[in-house]
């Protein structure tokens, strides 16, 4: 015997890809974490225009807005560890306050378009749930992109 034990605790609960703003999606929704990674790989930080011509439920454009604002992922969700008694609620509040203090205010040129009016309606609703409805412009766009 080696007298070893491994103790693992789930501090998070639901995965971080569940940001909480996408109650409704469309066919082939993109996970929020993957959308955020795509935006970060594009090196978008809010200074240049951002365009998603096939926006679907708006996940990529919404993540672009959250990144431009420097919004902490998961700020609007709860974590399993918050129910543990040995971490005071004030510690969670302080962490949230610190994250909010690091957010940027600004005007960003973020646009999402889709041929499907229902998808655009869902994208607008998701942007509102994410708190970025004033930062992202969604339009039904039937123009050919070819």
Model regions and ranges:
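Non-catalytic substrate-recognition/targeting regions of SAM-dependent transferases
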Residues: 1-22
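Glycine-rich, flexible loop/turn motifs
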Residues: 12, 17, 26, 71, ...
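Class I SAM-dependent methyltransferase Rossmann-like catalytic core
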Residues: 20-30
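Conserved S-adenosyl-L-methionine
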Residues: 30, 34-141
């Amino acid at each position: 015997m080696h007298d070893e034990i491994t103790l693992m605790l789930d501090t998070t609960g639901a995965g971080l890809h569940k940001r909480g703003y996408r109650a409704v999606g469309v066919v082939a929704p993109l996970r929020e974490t993957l959308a955020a990674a795509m935006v970060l790989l594009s090196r978008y930080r809010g200074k240049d225009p951002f365009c998603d011509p096939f926006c679907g439920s708006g996940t990529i454009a919404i993540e672009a807005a959250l990144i431009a604002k420097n919004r902490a992922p998961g700020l609007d969700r709860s974590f399993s560890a918050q129910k543990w008694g040995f971490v005071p609620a004030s510690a969670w509040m302080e962490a949230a306050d610190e994250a909010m203090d690091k957010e940027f205010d600004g005007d960003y040129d973020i646009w999402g378009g889709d041929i499907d009016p229902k998808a655009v309606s869902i994208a607008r609703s998701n942007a509102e749930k994410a708190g970025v409805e004033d930062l992202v412009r969604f339009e039904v766009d039937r123009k050919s992109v070819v």
